[in-house]
Amino acid sequence: MKLMHTSDWHIGKIVNQRHMTFDQEYILDNLVKMLEAERPDVLVVAGDIYDRGIPPVEAVELLDKVLSNILLQLGIPIIMIAGNHDSPDRLGFGSRLLRDKGLYISGPLLKDIQKVVLCDEYGPVNFYLIPYASPAVVREVFACNEVCDHDTAMKEMIRCIREKWNAEERNVVVTHGFIRGMEELEQSESEKPLSITLAVGGTDFVDVKHFDGFAYTALGHLHGPQQAGSPRVRYAGSLLKYSFSETKQEKSVTLAQIGKDGELSIECKSLLPLRNMRRIKGTLKGLLDPEVYANTNIEDYLHVTLTDEGELIEPMSKLRAVYPNILSLDIEIKERQVTESKTSAGQGYKHKSKLDLFSDFYTDMTGQMFTEEKALIVAKTISTLETDEREL
């Protein structure tokens, strides 16, 4: 069976006050074209369909358009679960009616975990849909007092699946969470923590060992495509970059082929966005030089770091005349190389000239050499001020 695994669409996302819906429509249209070319047996979307529980109207309309194209025009079934950004009840509304059209949505968590059976030439493939739910919800739904965190919650849900499954068949889990083995996972700033403990650096992870024996586990939540402790357990990642911590990530969808006896092959297929998200760095004059930006996409979403010394007048407006989609800007603060203490540097200040005092101050504050050119400018300014003072 050939499945296309994606996640974290975050339709309706706003990044630095910029609505991403147009970019999302572009990338989702390309996803539909890829589906048409690859013709997988099923599309799996592992949570965070929307960016917030109550999505804007344009986000709902975009999802309706995309799902209609996939289901009605291409005839490809869709399996979809709620993530931690979604409202389970809203996402799952009408799901039983939509099953006949090939759209399988798991919104609110149910004790009888939804099982979707799809068949290929080798027989059935069983998809177990586990939407995101907090440990408190899992504890209540499964009436299990042993559930105290995300790991014990997943352990209980997988235990219930194993009570009823046929281990000889090909079984797939679709879920949304923080699953890991021994290795570190690549994270990004746009991923909302699943709990307070994660937000303050806790270890509220789910052990990848819970998924032993499954042919494939399709994960959502982390935005970088990567495996999670096992080649059979993967994050597909988001389709777009949603923070500047993701600039080095290569966004893709995952094509997973599950053979007759559960043998697995993985291929990552890239989708090119309308606008990339990049960091650029340099002086204001340098970044405005046509030779610098001539061979780049000036429409990209940018974080700009300026390396100029001294005051700049309206740098953002000047930069946006060339780069219209700058989302953030900062000024590089060079590390100061202090070779002596301020106390020793200040010794003998009563016997120093104003120019020498300013030179010491400048070097101490910036860590830069006080050049002869700068000394001439400051000396002229001091002379002018002293002349004006005498005339008063």
Question: What positions do the PLM features span?
Answer:
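Conserved beta-sheet core of the metallophosphoesterase superfamily
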Residues: 185-264
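Accessory, non-catalytic peripheral segments of nucleic-acid enzymes
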Residues: 37, 42, 257-392
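Conserved catalytic scaffold of divalent metal-dependent phosphoesterases
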Residues: 93-97, 101-199, 259
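N-terminal active-site segment of His-dependent metallophosphoesterases
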Residues: 1-68, 75, 373, 380, ...
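Active-site neighborhood of phospho(di)ester-bond hydrolases with catalytic His/Asp-centered motifs
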Residues: 6-7, 43-48, 77-84, 104-109, ...
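Binuclear metal-dependent phosphoesterase catalytic core
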Residues: 113-121, 125, 130, 233-297
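Metal-dependent catalytic neighborhoods of phosphoester/phosphodiester hydrolases
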Residues: 14-16, 49-67, 82-101, 107, ...
